């Protein structure tokens, strides 16, 4: 039994949860300033313990389980979502990585594609028409945008000739070659994580709260812990694939962290700026715009890779 290995992985997961907690605080602070008001500032020093106060409040509440719901998948779906989000953090490509996966990009695609099951299970098992409609929207949206996401990732892999995130660290020029690819990738990430302007799985103005309408207390917290952990890991992988640096050691880790924070702040900026799209516009965007563009960039990447 490799004790240092498990200790390293456990520390990565604990720090990922801490990062997720403070990211929720950062989002609330930023949204407050966007709305010309103060964010959370009453709990402790400048509101810093606010995420932990929220977590304690939610997890000590009684869990209400609707009688018509299918109990086992209803309880299992939020836990599954958080576990899948944390599984992606295992391949965090820092300079002293202990968990080495040669095909980490393939691992990332496999785990991220499983997230659709958590949305579907949560909506279907709630036995509520609003939750089911939100789940069906979320499933259709996620599957549609995964096609473009896979093609964009494939274009990057053809040029970089590696499926290992740690080796992608040394390539710093792909963003300048494929700026349209990076923009489409970021918009696809917004759809994959169900964030504004693609938050149709929730759709408060139409579906009360969407697929999570029947959830409360700790299970509700688990759903949103998974969502924010996914946002951070998507920001991290965007930094690795498109914004890698030539620096090494501690400097590369620091640059990666700063890039990830910047991209995570961009998620908040988009939420504060744009309204929710119409659902038919969402589907037209991926099938009529992103898919042809992704295929065109994929065809361009093959001769570029041959010339390098």
From Swiss-Prot:
Localization of this protein: Mitochondrion inner membrane
Gene Ontology MF: a single term: NADH dehydrogenase (ubiquinone) activity
TM region positions: 3-23, 73-93, 103-123, 143-163, 168-188, 217-237, 250-270, 288-308
Keyword terms of this UniProt record: Electron transport, Membrane, Mitochondrion, Mitochondrion inner membrane, NAD, Respiratory chain, Translocase, Transmembrane, Transmembrane helix, Transport, Ubiquinone
RNA-binding listed as a keyword: no
Catalytic activity reported: a ubiquinone + NADH + 5 H(+)(in) = a ubiquinol + NAD(+) + 4 H(+)(out)
GO BP terms, alphabetized: aerobic respiration
InterPro entries: NADH_UbQ_OxRdtase_su1/FPO, NADH_UbQ_OxRdtase_su1_CS
Transcription regulation found in the keyword field: no
Enzyme kind, highest EC tier: translocase
Top-rank taxon, per record: Eukaryota
Gene Ontology cellular component annotations, sorted alphabetically: mitochondrial inner membrane
The protein's Enzyme Commission number: 7.1.1.2
Principal subcellular localisation of the protein: mitochondrion
Alphabetized Pfam families for the sequence: NADHdh
Protein's membrane topology: Multi-pass membrane protein
UniProt similarity note: Belongs to the complex I subunit 1 family.
Function statement: Core subunit of the mitochondrial membrane respiratory chain NADH dehydrogenase (Complex I) that is believed to belong to the minimal assembly required for catalysis. Complex I functions in the transfer of electrons from NADH to the respiratory chain. The immediate electron acceptor for the enzyme is believed to be ubiquinone.
Protein name: NADH-ubiquinone oxidoreductase chain 1
Native source species: Lumbricus terrestris
């Amino acid at each position: 039994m490799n004790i240092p290995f498990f200790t390293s992985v456990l520390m990565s997961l604990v720090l990922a949860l801490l990062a997720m907690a403070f990211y929720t605080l950062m989002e609330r602070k930023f949204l407050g300033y966007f709305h010309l008001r103060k964010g959370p500032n009453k709990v402790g020093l400048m509101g810093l313990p606010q995420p932990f106060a929220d977590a304690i409040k939610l997890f000590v509440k009684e869990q209400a389980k609707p009688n018509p719901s299918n109990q086992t998948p209803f309880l299992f779906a939020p836990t599954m979502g958080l576990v899948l989000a944390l599984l992606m953090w295992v391949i965090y490509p820092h300079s002293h990585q202990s968990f080495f996966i040669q095909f980490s990009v393939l691992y990332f695609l496999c785990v991220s594609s499983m997230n659709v099951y958590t949305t579907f299970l949560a909506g279907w098992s709630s036995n509520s028409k609003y939750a089911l409609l939100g789940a069906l929207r979320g499933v259709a949206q996620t599957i549609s945008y995964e096609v473009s996401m896979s093609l964009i990732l494939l274009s990057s892999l053809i040029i970089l000739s590696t499926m290992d995130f740690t080796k992608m660290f040394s390539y710093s020029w792909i963003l300048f070659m494929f700026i349209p690819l990076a923009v489409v990738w970021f918009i696809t990430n917004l759809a994959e994580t169900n964030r504004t302007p693609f938050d149709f799985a929730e759709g408060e103005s139409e579906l009360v709260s969407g697929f999570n309408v029947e959830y409360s207390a700790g299970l509700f917290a688990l759903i949103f812990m998974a969502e924010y952990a996914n946002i951070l890991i998507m920001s991290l992988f965007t930094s690795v694939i498109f914004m890698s640096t030539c620096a090494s050691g501690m400097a590369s880790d620091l640059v990666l962290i700063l890039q990830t924070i910047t991209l995570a702040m961009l998620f908040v900026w988009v939420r504060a700026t744009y309204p929710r799209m119409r659902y038919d516009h969402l589907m037209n965007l991926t099938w009529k715009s992103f898919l042809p563009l992704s295929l065109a960039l994929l065809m361009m990447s093959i001769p570029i890779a041959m010339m390098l």
